[in-house]
Amino acid sequence: MASTVFLTNRSAESVELNDNDVPLINLAEVETDGKSATASVFGLMARKAICNEGLGCTLVNKDYDPNIKIPVPQRVKNDNDLAFPYGDKEPKDTVFPNVDYDQLQKAMDQAFTNNEVQKTRTVLVAHKNHIIGEKYLEGFTKDTPILGWSMTKSVLATLYGILEYEGKIDLNEPVLLEGWEKDDRKKITLNHLLRMQSGLEWEEDYTSISDVTRMLFMDADMTKAQGEKKAIAAPTEVWNYSSGTSNLLSGILRKRFKTHQEYINYPYQALIDKIGMSSMLMETDMKGNFVGSSYAWANTRIGLSLDYCI
């Protein structure tokens, strides 16, 4: 609720209808003052999210100190006169003779049918670097930031790719977290983590209280959850989708910088602002780590632009 209202300027009523109207979540009572939101179910387990300009919103617990100054990313947004996919100016109206625009429109309309279940917000279709189809749910526009969820993992992985390209990192070097040197986890490399082939135990189940839901909704420091798990297979032996791994990588990335300011600047300086994704914002956990598994916001055009770049 807090992020959606604060970052997208949508009403609380719109969020309740289009985002939170699902079993269990729709039981929550939410209070918001524009800079924070508190939610609870039947008056129990109240959780609060606070919002800060430039950082988005963060779940906090009883240890949160509002008097501590939080560093904000120092951004230099590069506005240019380029259209999609190289900038955010309006694309040229280009018609392709081999595209059946009537069928395209029907396909986009279909994406919004039965929308009380599908909950489609936007549809964007591109062909040969041109936007040829675009449709939005009422209340959404081309400028509305949308939560990227696991697309955020691609942003994080790209940052590691940039570091490798610049010769600043060896993806085949062992990670060697504290305690890993004592067992088979000492064999795990950055490459294994990026490919989600580390062999570490992890449960990615959003329908129950699991590793991923505990991490995203309970942990003040989301970078630790995966690193505390035991190995259940040798590296490369199995593939296991893990948001915990992405946040572990976010924590490892943080340790490569001398200051927290350098860390929170890096995604914007190296990638996001550098290629003109000015509407994108990455949120952090309570300890200031980027939630590299899930919490990047951007409008739909920017999201597709990133796909083109990758």
Model-derived regions, located:
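Stable alpha-helical elements in mature extracytoplasmic
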Residues: 11, 103-107, 171, 186-190, ...
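Short, charged, amphipathic alpha-helices and their helix-cap/turn boundaries
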Residues: 102-104, 130-135, 209-235, 261-280
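Conserved catalytic neighborhood of penicillin-recognizing serine enzymes
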Residues: 181-237, 241-247
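Active-site helix/loop module of the DD-peptidase/beta-lactamase fold
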Residues: 165-201, 228-231, 258-297
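Non-catalytic propeptide/linker segments at domain boundaries
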Residues: 43-115
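A short, well-structured edge-of-sheet supersecondary motif
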Residues: 38-39, 105-140
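Active-site SXXK
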Residues: 129, 146-172, 193, 248-253, ...
